[in-house]
From Swiss-Prot:
This is Progonadoliberin-3. The keyword Secreted applies. GO terms for cellular component: extracellular space. Residues 1-15 form the signal peptide. Pfam families: GnRH. It is found in: Secreted. It comes from Oncorhynchus mykiss (Rainbow trout). PANTHER family: GONADOLIBERIN (PTHR10522), PROGONADOLIBERIN-2 (PTHR10522:SF6). The modification Pyrrolidone carboxylic acid is found at Q16. Belongs to the GnRH family. Keywords: Amidation, Cleavage on pair of basic residues, Hormone, Pyrrolidone carboxylic acid, Secreted, Signal. The gene is gnrh3. The modification Glycine amide is found at G25.
Length: 74
């Protein structure tokens, strides 16, 4: 049992972490980087390029469904 737990822990710690918006190797797409820079310049207001905002909204749809299901007050 201890060997199985150790193997599972090793697998999780050695696997690559995929953060939302990041590509393998710790690289971000150019559109998201531009949005981050623009957000810093505007005092926290995010201004996305048009093609990026359409792409991001498509990717976020499943997450919106999950959030509405688990957090109905937001």
């Amino acid at each position: 049992v201890q060997v199985v737990v150790l193997a599972l822990v090793a697998q999780v710690t050695l696997s690559q972490h995929w953060s939302y918006g990041w590509l393998p190797g710790g690289k971000r797409s150019v559109g998201e980087l531009e949005a981050t820079i623009k957000m810093m310049d505007t005092g926290g207001v995010v201004v996305l390029p048009e093609e990026t905002s359409a792409h991001v909204s498509e990717r976020l749809r499943p997450y919106d469904v999950i959030l509405k299901k688990w957090m109905p007050h937001k």
